[in-house]
Amino acid sequence: MVNRERMVEEFLQLVSIDSLSKKERQMADTLVQKLKAIGYEVIEDNAGEKIGGNTGNLICTVKGTKNVPAVMLAAHMDTVEPGVGKKPNIDGDYIKSDGTTVLGGDDASGVECILEALRVMKEKNLEHGDIQVVFTIAEEGGLFGAKNLDYSHIYARYGFVLDSDGTIGAIAVKAPSQNKIFVTVNGKASHAGMAPEKGISAIQIAAAAISRMKLGRIDFETTANIGIINGGRETNVICERVDIKAEARSRDKLKLEKQTAHMRECFEQAASEFGGSVDFKAESEYPSYNIPKNAPIIGILQKAAASADIELLLEETGGGSDTNIYNSKGIEAVDISVGMDKVHSVEERILIDDMVKAAEFLLAIIQNVA
């Protein structure tokens, strides 16, 4: 039922719009126009003001024609860098970037699937329950749009987030919590050539701590990483301060706590040995979610997959998304693949057939809500 040519044309338009995190104004204005052209009103919340962006989240409620639970269809408007001056091109069966920027299919492909589903529902007069469309800002780097969404407008029971790569039919039903970790290692400055004995190297403390740390893949549901290290002024000065940004993730709360405590202990022990000190702060970036196989939303997906002739793949992921936040707000939500590939790179691409198939799957989902 979806219009392939229309989807391709509109997707090319969407990914050509500059829409970096906190700078989604042009994308938001474009989507408001498109939703109004279909026949729906749009609310813009004040999330942008809260996070220092130039637009808020968009919320569009489509009243249903039958009495079934309301659903939320969600995608995010922002892209990662390099994302300015994107020039998409069709290369055979794929739409790709020109190799100098990301394509922006993360998450314009999700946005496009939602727009096309709404049009088809209207054109074909298909029955459906209430649909709440949510296009968020600043998903990349912190899920800030979803965290600051005005939930007073949201009453959907189920959420379908179109923001995942992989095979069409792949559904992320379990995702981790993440702790962002900020560490300051304090040493003592001294002349590196004339009085190194009087100094305490913060770099040496940090190196000792990290060398003892369990990092990377800890187990099947837990990971940890040291991402950013800054420190030092000159080669002839013993470094007195190092700032480190790290993270730990796990789909198990106790494992996340254990890994975070382990990283703290490594830093504190190393600082004690060398006579320095450490300031260690861990902040919860987002909570985990786990949708059981007998949850109502899984039943909806199973029926939709069968009607759309799609193999349903219930998967666990190591990444976070707006889906984590929606579940924490009481919305039973899953993350659905829309076929994006090689995301967050200049090699990003999407198979046109996959995007079309994802839109068809979304239509089937809407029609199978009961």
Question: How would you name each of these model-derived features?
Answer:
Residues 1-25, 284, 341-345:
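N-terminal capping segment at the start of a domain
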